[in-house]
Amino acid sequence: LSISFFTRLREIPAVMDFSVTVQPGEAVGLVGESGCGKSTVALGVMQDLGVNGRVVGGKIKFKGQDLSKVSPEKLRDIRGNEIAMIYQEPMASLNPAMKIGKQLIEVPIIHEGVSEEEAYLRAEEVIRDVKLPDVDRILKSYPHQLSGGQQQRIVIAMALMSKPALLILDEPTTALDVTVEAAVVDLVKDLGKKYGTSMLFISHNLGLILETCDQICVMYSGEAVETGSISDVFDKMQHPYTQALFRSIPLPGADKNTRPLIAIPGNFPLPHERPDGCNFGPRCNYFQDGSCNSQPIPMNKITGFERHFSRCLRINEIDWEAPMSISSQQEKVPPGDVVLKIDNLKKYYEVAANALFGSSGTYKTVKANETLSFEARESETLAIVGESGCGKSTFAKVLMGLETATDGNILLDNKSIGSIPIEARETETVADIQMVFQNPFDTLNPSMTVGRQIVRALEVFKFGKSDDERSDRMLQLLDLVKLPREFATRMPRQLSGGQKQRVGIARAFAGGARIVVADEPVSALDVSVQAAVTDLLMEIQRKEKTTLLFISHDLSIVRYLSDRVMVMYLGHVVELGTTDQVFSPPYHPYTEALLSAVPIADTSVHAKLLQSRQVTS
C-alpha cells in the first residue's frame, strides 16, 4: 500500500510499500512516532483521506473486496456495520448537544433499520459491556457530564453498537490517566474476545501494545520496518530502529546514574526530505555507506519465523544479542541545602452553586490542596505523582505565584512567598522559580524568533548590561540545551516538538533558576525524543545544581529520574519517600494501584490491575 497527499507544488508520500494482514479475531498493533504514517493507514482503511489524499499503489482489501473500488453506498454500509474507528479525543467524537442514549441508538436505527425500542435495549447492553455504572443515568446524560474515561468508554460502546468485524483504535488512551487507561485497555481486550472483533491498535506506547495485541507492526517514516508476533519482535528484534526504540524507554532497572537511557541521535525526516535507501540510515549505528543508501530496501522474511519480517539489509550481519554498550555513567550528586520548604499549604476554591453544585445562592468549597508539607533540596529531583484532579497542577500554580495560598506557608530560602502573587514578587524570586510546560506547541510565541524569546526572558530578569551581553548569554543557553546556534533566527513553526521543548527549557534557565517546575514536560513528545529531553534536563540540573520538581503521571519516567517521590490523591500527600522506598513494598494502597496500572514493554513482566473504580471528586 502506498498513500500520498498532493499539494499545489508536489506529491508528498505519506505511506510507502506498506503491508499488514489482520486475521479474524486478531489484534495487530501499529507502533511508531508522530508522522510515521500510522494514522494515515487507518484513514486509508476507512477511505477517509480527504480531498488531497490518494492511494497511489497497492490495495486495501476487507473480506476480499478492494475498498477503493466499492460504491459510496456500499462503503457507507461497510463503515456503518463492519468497520468502526475509535479516535484519540473522545469529546471530538461525541455530539455535545445530544444525550448519550440518542447518539448510541442512531447507529443501529440508520444502518440496520431496527426499531427504537430494540436499539435502546442494545444500547443498555453495550453500556453494561463497557462496565459503566448506573446505565439509565448514563444514557440520559450529556457528554460534558461524564469524565474523560467515561466518555472514552461511550465511544467504544458506540463503535460496538454495530458489532463490527474490524475495530480501529487510534491512540484511544493518550488523554487518560494511567489507572483509567489500564481499565480501558483491559476492557478493549475483553470485548475483542467477547465479540470476536479484529483490532488494529495504533499507539506509540510499546507497553500497551504488549498488553493488547497478538501481532505488531513497527513503522518509521512511512514504511513498515519490522512486523511479527509480539514475542518475536519484543524478544528477538531484528531491526535497528526497533532496538533503538526499546533502548530509549525507561524499563524497570533503568537508572539515570548507572543505566542512562540511550536517545536516538538525529531527527525524524520530513516526508520531502527522506534519504535514499534506508529511511533510518542517517540515525542508524549499523549504517554502511554504499549499500544501505544505494537502493530501496524490501521487507525480508526472517529465517525460521513464519510471520516475522524486517526491512534491513544487514539483518544477518548484525549481532542482535550483543549487550547494550553502557553510555558514560554519572556520579550521583548528593543533595545540598534545603531551598524550598512547604508548610501545611492549603488551597481552597469557592465555587458558586448551581444545578450541579446544590441550590443557588450558596457556595461550595473545593479543597484542591490540603495540608501539603515537604522540603526540596539543591540538586534534587522531587517527583510529584498523581492522577488528574489530585491537586498537583494547583500546587504548581501556587508555587509560581499564579494563585495565592489559602493557608500555610511556602518558604524559598526561608523567605515566605506563598501569599505573594507573581506581579508583586521581586524579579529575583520570579527568576528563581521557573516552569517548563507540558505542551511545547502552546508555550512559544509563534511570531517571535527563538533567539528573541530567550533574550526577552533575559530582559525581564534584568540580565546583562547590554544587548550584546544578552545575545551572548542566549547563544550559551542554546548550547546548554544542545540546539545549533543558527536556531536563534528560526521561528517556532520551523522546529519539531522536541526542539520546541528545548527552547522552553532554555527560557526557564535564562535567569539562572534555582527551582524548575517541570509539568509533564515529555508527555506530548515521541518516545525517542522523550529520552533526549529527559537526559538533557538531568544534565543541566547537574551543571546548574537546580532543584527539579517533576510533575507527572508516568511512573516509568518518575522511577528513572527522581531522587524522591511524593504521591498525591485528592489534594492530600498519601506517600512521600525516596524513589526506592516508594517503589518497593510495603506500598500505600493507592501507590500500588498506580504502579499496577503502568504498562511495561517487557514480555517477562506480568502486570495486574488492582484498581478500576472511579476516582471521587
Task: Annotate the PLM regions.
Residues M46-G50, M400:
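Helix-to-loop junction immediately C-terminal to a conserved catalytic motif
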Residues S229-V339, A352-S360, T578-S617:
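Charged, flexible cofactor/metal-binding loops and thiol motifs
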Residues E33, Q47, L176, V180-R259, ...:
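P-loop NTP-binding/switch modules centered on Walker-like glycine-rich loops
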Residues L67-A84, I110, D232-M237, P269-P275, ...:
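ABC ATPase NBD coupling module
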Residues D66, E118-R137, F246, D468-E486, ...:
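Conserved ABC ATPase "signature" region
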Residues R54-D66, G408-S419, T429:
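Conserved ABC transporter NBD signature motif
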